[in-house]
Amino acid sequence: MTKSVEGYLKEQELAAETDSEKDDDKISIRLTNFVGPNAHSFSFDPLVRYWNRKQNNLPIYIGRYTERYNGGDVSAIVFRSKVVSRRHAQIFYENNTWYIQDMGSSSGTFLNHVRLSPPSKTSKPYPISNNDILQLGADYRGGHEVNYRCVRARVELNNSWKIKLSPYNLNEFKRMQELVLCGSSESGPPECCICLMPVLPCQALFVAPCSHSYHYKCIRPTLNESHPYFSCFICRKYHDLEAPVEEGDESLNDLLRNATVKDDASE
């Protein structure tokens, strides 16, 4: 027996509400590698840290990896870039706001391209918001060597990077299947938002994790420039295209096995 989209999503909403009640005091921050146009960047995997509202958490320290670091402070964020100071900056949460503070680094901490303090001077805490750009240090000798590149990161707060299940996601998945297997739908083929030409079967397509699709030829320059990250032109979601497959939500597999998509055009 299959479930309707509405019934399945209702169950998912109830489950999400239950989980949110359990983790109501737990908030998160994620740093993902930011690749700007014509700029070198120190590459790193996405980093997620959690903060408990009810506990007196220590600040999340950011600094350079050294041989003395033994991983004892699991919340610390360390990079192997030599332009990052040993104790470069710290992040903390206070009064419902995330803050970044430079701890007297020599090469500087930049928030949205603005330096927080002079060299070797501790800055005041500055509030950070979702999608802010954080930079640690500055490129040395043009950044031609990887270990002498600054660290640029996009800030994502409180699970904002997670894609929630929605009727749109389900309908887009079914539409793409029908597009490949059975040709265009009765309402007409969709358009690529870059070239405004129809997206048709047998074309090379790129489908983002948010289910928005593009002609691969149209989107390829953007993918090459920002790989392995991609910011969708339509919904502005920021994706890690090299995220391990096993990190996928198990509920998606259950959804594809059990849920059916209602076809309004057939009524």
Swiss-Prot record:
A GO BP entry is: positive regulation of sporulation
Q: Where is the FHA domain?
A: 60-116
User: What superkingdom does the record give?
Assistant: Eukaryota
Q: Which InterPro entries match?
A: FHA_dom, SMAD_FHA_dom_sf, Znf_RING, Znf_RING/FYVE/PHD
Q: What is recorded about the protein's domains?
A: The FHA domain is required for the proper localization at the SPB.
Catalytic reaction(s) noted: S-ubiquitinyl-[E2 ubiquitin-conjugating enzyme]-L-cysteine + [acceptor protein]-L-lysine = [E2 ubiquitin-conjugating enzyme]-L-cysteine + N(6)-ubiquitinyl-[acceptor protein]-L-lysine
Q: How does it assemble?
A: Interacts with sid4.
Instruction: Please give the name of this protein.
Output: Probable E3 ubiquitin-protein ligase dma1
- Zinc finger motifs (RING-type), residue ranges: 192-236
Instruction: Name where it mostly resides.
Output: cytoplasm
Q: Listed GO molecular functions?
A: ubiquitin protein ligase activity; zinc ion binding
Provide one Gene Ontology cellular component. Answer: meiotic spindle pole body
- Origin species, per record, is Schizosaccharomyces pombe (strain 972 / ATCC 24843) (Fission yeast)
Concerning its family, UniProt says: Belongs to the DMA1 family.
Does Ubl conjugation count among this protein's keywords?
no
Job description of the protein: Probable E3 ubiquitin-protein ligase which is a component of the spindle assembly checkpoint, required to prevent septum formation and premature exit from mitosis if spindle function is compromised. Inhibits the septation initiation netwok (SIN) during spindle checkpoint activation. The effect appears to be mediated through preventing the SIN activator, plo1 kinase, from localizing to the SPB.
Q: Where in the cell is it found?
A: Cytoplasm, Cytoskeleton, Microtubule organizing center, Spindle pole body
